[in-house]
Amino acid sequence: MNLKLLKISCMFLLLGSGNAAYSQLQEWSAGFRIGEPGGFMARRYSDNGINALEVNIGTYGGLWGTDRKYQDGTFNNIGYSINVLYLWHHPTIINSDLHTYYGFGPQLNSRDWYANKASNNLAATKRASAMGATAVGGIEYFPIDAPNLSFFSEIGFYTEIAPNPFFFHLQGGIGVRVNF
């Protein structure tokens, strides 16, 4: 009797775990990030279960880099950012509830900066709109008790293409997503 119960338990465990792993990656997810850039994101998973397209809208320079040299002046404030990332998403071998992802895409920023005026030591405010490339890598956890939620941590970088080529900015953060 114990062997039969063990076989039935194993069968339900295997069927249930496959269904749980499949249900974690829904078609869409939306959430927020605390970090750089901070804000809201929406993600659309592809049918192959590996790729995703993510759009992030939020702040730029809020966590680190608020007071930083830029061209012939400095940033002294928080700006706005939007980026679109093409991602590759994989469950880890250690735990199917733990996924890794990485990707890249374009990023647009808008931020005030203060140009130095050598003649009278006053700063003139200018609006800097910039375009560049961003890359990211992260880890995401899908709790078994809350299959529609996921928690993530990521790190990446932004390098500006225009107007200040090769301006480098570290990015990353933590956040939560709702999968639906």
Where are these predicted regions, by residue range?
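Transmembrane beta-strand segments that form the barrel wall of outer-membrane beta-barrel proteins
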Residues: Q24-P37, I50-G61, S153-I161
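Gram-negative (and chloroplast) outer-membrane scaffold detector with strong preference
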Residues: S46-F151
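Membrane-spanning beta-strands of outer-membrane beta-barrel proteins
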Residues: L25, G35, N77-G79, A130-G132, ...
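Outer-membrane beta-barrel "beta-signal"
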Residues: H169-F180
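Membrane-embedded beta-strand positions in outer-membrane beta-barrel channels/transporters
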Residues: S29, G39-M41, S81-L85, T134-V136, ...
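Bacterial Sec-dependent N-terminal signal peptides
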Residues: M1-Q26
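Outer-membrane beta-barrel porins/channels
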Residues: A135, Y158, A162-P165
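N-terminal beta1-alpha1 ligand-phosphate binding loop
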Residues: G35-Y45
